[in-house]
Amino acid sequence: MVELQVRDATAGDLAAAGAAWSKLQEFHRSLGLAFPLPEDAAQKWLDSFQRTLGRFSFLWVMGPTIQVSAFLLARVKQSPAFLGAVQVGEISDLHVDESLRGSGAGTLLVDAAMHKFQELGMHSVEVQVQAGNDAGLQFWRKQGFHQELALVRKLLKD
């Protein structure tokens, strides 16, 4: 049995994390994700957090460098003033390769994020789950999360 280890991502992990993120988006699109993804979506995703890594965004991975088999991206954000202007942790992306599902890899990644958020004194942590991802919703409930909001969307263009 292979020992699962969570580690901070390095520059050498970014391309593999971007490829894993693309797989995650393919899954989300199969469930009905309404946003179009440009050809360079993975690079734009990486660009969205690289400069804030270690301060307001955190990327943990599993697997050897350049061969990421699981990752979690977490971000720090602030609620609006009318909601107390508190700092909130956001787990924006979690992907575990099919070969590791059921191994506890996802839970280990979530534990790393929760530890960081507790260390930073976050008010709460939120996660968005794509509609139709029942297994994902069940996973988050097992992690102690509960449903608070439901997002609805109407497309204005075809």
Feature names for model-found ranges:
Residues 61, 67-76, 90, 95:
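Conserved beta-strand in the GNAT
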Residues 1-15, 158:
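Conserved N-terminal entry element of GNAT/NAT acetyltransferase domains
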Residues 84-98, 150-153:
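Conserved acetyl-CoA binding element of GNAT-fold acetyltransferases
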Residues 107, 131-149:
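Conserved active-site alpha-helix within GNAT-family acetyltransferase domains
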Residues 100, 104-112:
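Conserved acetyl-CoA pyrophosphate-binding loop and the N-cap/start of the following alpha-helix
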